[in-house]
């Protein structure tokens, strides 16, 4: 006999060999029906596991984040089984759960297009109806290699597993190399939908074979699936790539200019200017000084900072000038440290706060490029604060105030903080235990002092230090990583940053890396989708369009534009040959905040007929001075 303790403190005696699914049935039929896995002594396990040792026990249902993860993982297995039944001879690789769904990369024996997805879905439903038990087996690596003797992808994975035994999950005739856990049977899969087909290189390496990647989503109920698909439809309507084209904001010319290099049209450049100007204004108010450090950097600087060793794959190839190799700049911090080192520093000067809107270049793989969210040419709202260890909390609070003011102005008030830490087992970090410990301690203390709740995320730190990432939700509830604050005890020492302390001795400053919106391009994509292209008045590239009723009113329309433009508004005149009604429709599609209709009456009175976005055909006659003050008020309030 053994004893298990439930979350409510109740204890249960379990017999030898009794399985977790049996314990769930003893507690109640509803729990037995809803549980997908269990947490036993802090570890997620399958329900058919015997409870021989006892301990702390909690059952996990599909409506919890962990249960949903398991449900989606199991649905990926069902999809893989369906594909093997429909396309015999196909080779499985990996099929993990991801945000809102799952995918599986497969070397398909044949070809799968999106037209084939309904047939695969139907086969998955058939597998669910079979209600096949899902069982875990542990086998030797030798046995696993025998099972996968014709699958080089799985053999590669098996060779990388450090243990002598590996786990296999079986359901009917299907089996897959997997750590698990999984749902008890295929009848517990819930509602699912296959969504798209794409190409993906094995392990993301362009030198490896191209595989077929099939994406899907899975939810506990049909109602939840329908709600998600509705949100997805809304997201497609807000897709920044489509809206950016329709609103004349940006374009791409991959053949002429290159993939991943966005080109901004006049309205897009205006939007960039407004976004960056807002951040510049706020951080100037908080004591930051703006600098400029160019586009090219001697490669030796990145060797000293550690970037060349840890970041080389994300850099463009070097350009050689005699004995010197230059790199397109992928980050600003080494250049800002060079500025700090340009003259002797005293403790009286600290903190020194540098900010820069710098164009950076990162060699993203072509398959990972996506609109403005993943580009090769990007503009980062980067800042670096050189301070003493005692000033870290105060400077963190200052950076936090900037982040909050900017995100709040855009309506991002629902965000959480992820504390990205080093994974001690990972090899991608600069090795210095003492400095890592001090950096993590300083960042935790700063978060605690600011009263911020945070979730640790091991393995997500930068190679030189921990960071606090601000994860914000947009109007559709989607989460985006926007702002970040990093604490760095390592790079300043590597690049020789020093100041003379109050004691007359030389000291190395602490470096805070800080970004408010991340990159201008990615944040613009987020804003386009957040607002569905209907930017608030202060942010709209064009705030008003003057529409003449007839050609004879064009001269007055241009005088209106001139007066409002002199007052600081961004105004255009629609002098196209279209009818007035078509002009109204076309400019409404451009999501212009104000349409100003002018005809005989308005010209005689010196007024405009104002039609505001979102208010239908309602019009209000206003004098130019009154309209100007109205818009100025909205801009001042950032509405």
UniProtKB/Swiss-Prot annotation:
Tell me where in this chain the TGS domain is found: 1-61
DNA damage found in the keyword field: no
Q: What class of enzyme is it?
A: ligase
Disulphide-bridged cysteine pairs: none
One matching Pfam family is: HGTP_anticodon
- One GO biological process term: threonyl-tRNA aminoacylation
What Gene Ontology cellular component terms go with this record? Answer: cytoplasm
UniProt keywords (A-Z) are: Aminoacyl-tRNA synthetase, ATP-binding, Cytoplasm, Ligase, Metal-binding, Nucleotide-binding, Protein biosynthesis, RNA-binding, tRNA-binding, Zinc
Which superkingdom? Bacteria
Positions with a binding annotation for Zn(2+): 333, 384, 513
Q: Where in the cell is it found?
A: Cytoplasm
**EC number(s) from the headed UniProt entry:** 6.1.1.3
Positions of the UniProt region annotated as Catalytic: 239-536
| Cofactor binding notes | Binds 1 zinc ion per subunit.
Its biological purpose: Catalyzes the attachment of threonine to tRNA(Thr) in a two-step reaction: L-threonine is first activated by ATP to form Thr-AMP and then transferred to the acceptor end of tRNA(Thr). Also edits incorrectly charged L-seryl-tRNA(Thr).
What family is it from? Belongs to the class-II aminoacyl-tRNA synthetase family.
Q: What is this protein called?
A: Threonine--tRNA ligase
